[in-house]
Amino acid sequence: MTPQDYIGHHLNNLQLDLRTFSLVDPHNHTATFWTLNIDSMFFSVVLGLLFLAMFRSVAKKATSGVPGKFQTFIEMIIGFVHGSVKDMYHGKSKVIAPLALTVFVWVFLMNLMDLLPIDLLPYIGEHIFGLPALRVVPSADVNITLSMALGVFILIIFYSIKMKGVGGFVKELTMQPFNHWAFIPVNLILEGVSLLSKPVSLGLRLFGNMYAGELIFILIAGLLPWWSQWVLNVPWAIFHILIITLQAFIFMVLTIVYLSMASEEH
């Protein structure tokens, strides 16, 4: 396999054609609306369940005495997220903090998959399960990141209408920044673009950073001899720990900020 083939192989998703419910050939297929990236969906669900299992286990075993190391770690994460929500969200909703915690930990776990050896799970998938392709970093799939951003967008609309009413939401889109009926078309364009840019930028920012990080690991593995890969892999992996944490934090912060803006007057 040439370096070009190796890189291309690792950038292919395991895809299911929803019209025939059969796996597609990643080398002779163009993705369509009816194509589902089942590897991204699988790892997203598994990591979500892992998050729920970890926090449920800690909640059941939590004691008022001296906590264990894992409980202390989880409490630090909860305290950090709670402090962030308290500083940035000025509404009264009780679901924002749990939502922010879910977003932060879930996105972090997705990003963390990028630190696994690049050939480990694809090799297992190919030689044990006969899978034609496998990508293990859900946040490097634009479909996953934009889907999560779409969920945030729906919440933005929900909280805007809940806090301001339908009339207030429509007025915000049509009467600002120019408070005159003659400027309604201009206001609608400006506010509409501003509103739609939030989920698009939120999803593409996470995707772009994680895709680039994954691609660098693939390039190192595909272009260098195996005995010299560690020279670049180790420093990049150490630096990437910061990237995956920072991207999870940014996604959480922007989610909180957008929902806070939706809950307030313009």
Curated annotation (Swiss-Prot):
Keyword Transferase among record annotations: no
Keyword Cell wall biogenesis/degradation: no
Transmembrane segments: 33-53, 95-115, 141-161, 206-226, 237-257
SUPFAM superfamilies: F1F0 ATP synthase subunit A
GO molecular function: proton-transporting ATP synthase activity, rotational mechanism
Membrane topology: Multi-pass membrane protein
InterPro entries, per the entry: ATP_syn_F0_a_bact/chloroplast (IPR045082), ATP_synth_F0_asu (IPR000568), ATP_synth_F0_asu_AS (IPR023011), F0_ATP_A_sf (IPR035908)
Subcellular location: Cell inner membrane
GO cellular component: plasma membrane; proton-transporting ATP synthase complex
Keywords, comma-separated and alphabetical: ATP synthesis, Cell inner membrane, Cell membrane, CF(0), Hydrogen ion transport, Ion transport, Membrane, Transmembrane, Transmembrane helix, Transport
GO biological process, one term: proton motive force-driven plasma membrane ATP synthesis
Pfam families: ATP-synt_A
Subunit structure, interactors included: F-type ATPases have 2 components, CF(1) - the catalytic core - and CF(0) - the membrane proton channel. CF(1) has five subunits: alpha(3), beta(3), gamma(1), delta(1), epsilon(1). CF(0) has three main subunits: a(1), b(2) and c(9-12). The alpha and beta chains form an alternating ring which encloses part of the gamma chain. CF(1) is attached to CF(0) by a central stalk formed by the gamma and epsilon chains, while a peripheral stalk is formed by the delta and b chains.
Family (UniProt): Belongs to the ATPase A chain family.
Function summary: Key component of the proton channel; it plays a direct role in the translocation of protons across the membrane.
Protein name per Swiss-Prot or TrEMBL: ATP synthase subunit a
Species annotation: Klebsiella pneumoniae subsp. pneumoniae (strain ATCC 700721 / MGH 78578)
Gene designation per UniProt: atpB
